[in-house]
Structure formats: C-alpha cells, structure tokens
Amino acid sequence: MELLINNKIKITINLPSKIDWINIPTFLDNYSDDESKITVLKKIVSKNQLTGTIYPTIINVLEMFGSDENKFRVFKIIKNHVLLIADINLLIDLIGLFIDDCFKMKLILEFNHHIYNVKHPFLEFMVKTINSDKNKIHVLSILVPKVLVLDNEDIIRTVHYLSDSFILVDFFKLISPKSKLSFDNVVDIMYTIKSDQQNLKILDVLVSNGFKVCPDQLLEMCRALKSTKSMTKMIGKIPLAKNISDTDKFCEKLAQIIIHPTDYINATDILNINQKISLQYKPHSQGNIIVSGFLTSHVVQKVFCEHEKTTIVYSNSTTMKWTKHSTEYTFINDNDAV
C-alpha cells in the first residue's frame, strides 16, 4: 500500500487486517519523521481492526512525537478509542506529556464530558503541571465539581505549593464545598500560609461552608496567627459550636495569647464575656498601681502568675503583663523585655 506524505512523498506500507494496539509503536518506528508516522497512524486507525488494550500504548505512541502540536494531532486521531476508557488517571498521564498550557487545556476539555465521580487525588498535580495561575483555576473549576469529596492530604499538599500564591483564596472558594477538612487540617493550613490577611480570607470561605470550632480550638487557631489584631478579627468571624463553660479559665488562656490590651478587650467584647471574676489579689494601695511612671486607678480583679511575670486583669477587662518590683509593677513589652 502506498501513502502520500504532505502530497509530496510516497511511502509503502504493508499492514495486516488486524493490529494489536501494543504493536503500533513498532510500525511507527519504521519512520523517522513525525509526518510519516502521523500518516501511517491515520491509515492504521481508519482501515484496520484494532485489538487489545489502548493503555498504556497511547502513552508510548505520544512519546514518539516531538512537539506538543503533533502529540495533540495524534491524540485527535485516536481520540474516540481513548475516551472509551477516559478517567482522571489517564488524563493525568496524558497531560504530563505536554509542555504548553494551550494543549493541556484542550486535552482537559476533550475529557470533560467523559469523566465522572473522580476519586483519585489530582489537585496537587494540576496546580504543579498547569503553568498559568488563571489556567490552574479554570482547570480546577472544571474538575472539582466531578468529585464527591476531595482528599484532605491532597488539599494540604496543594496549599503548601500555593502558600505564596495570590490565587490561594480562589482555590479555597472552589474546593471548600467539596472538602471535609478536619480542625487539625485547618490549623495545619493556617501555619502553612504566611499571611494573616490570607488566612482570614480563607477562614471566611470555610465559615460560609459551615466551619465551626469549640472554645479551646479557637484559642489554638489564635496561636496560628501573627498579629493580636488578626486574632481578634478571627474571633469575630468563627462561630462557636458550643458555649464557653468556664469563662475564668478561658480568659486566662486568652490573655496569655492576645497580650495587647485593646485587642484583648475587643476579643472579650466580641465573645460577650461578662468577666465577673472574684478579687484574688490586691496591691498594697487598693485602686492605684504605680506602673513605670504612670498611674492606673483600675481595681485589679485577677492575677495570673508565671515565674516572676504576672498578668493582671483589671476591672475594665484590660490585660497586661507586669513584673513586680517591691510595690511597683513594670510593664513587660511584646518581646518580654522589662
């Protein structure tokens, strides 16, 4: 049989009536240039009865071609056979053979209506393989709806990869309805993300999909943030799954985390904590404490002792840390320097 290549070159090929998929690379190996291989492949697919399984031969065949364009031409020739066995794993294998986003996107669109109920993790692979941030989000918008529940470990690995990316919030908007992140998963993600602002935006997304925490978990989440102001903002965003049972103990822990007095006051106001704490400690002169040169007249309500440092909660809910020197108290700044 004679075949014409680009209307110029004639080649002769002898083909049996039946060809096993596994033998196709052997036929194509007889030709050095892509155009000849493509012409022969067209003839094989159109004129012969194909037997056996197309996978993994499809991978071997595509690897024989140099450019993304020619690889995609080959895919189009055998597309109808490939899509009969289409699933997310095959899509991942094929995308990995292409360099340019253009052809990766075309491949995903070809598979789009042929894969359902995806179970195999794919998030990390897609965000690493697709080059453009815009295309990453577009690909995920196509594939995520095909999943019943996303794999938590896959989500966390992907967040590690995207930790400095401006598409991180968009990523969570896409995956949140299909995810069942545990509290530990969320805390892990918060520590991974460097920006408090990004964390707060992501928590907004999670809360909109039903995320709640218990009081002790809220304290743990505060520790994952850098700024006490951000901690206070977060407290205003996260709904509690149950009420605070012991406000004294909770406030003691909260005061050790949110050490800025104004932010602490705002946090307790948000939580509607009425601090009716019994007077456990009074300075020698009730109502007045000399603190590094300035006078405060708030009555001390409670003192938390830790080594030589003392945290005092005043009647106006202000919390500060001090070190006692005789009858005077010296303020300890955020760096614990007296």
From Swiss-Prot:
It comes from the Viruses. This is Uncharacterized protein L750. It comes from Acanthamoeba polyphaga mimivirus (APMV). The lineage of its organism: Viruses, Varidnaviria, Bamfordvirae, Nucleocytoviricota, Megaviricetes.
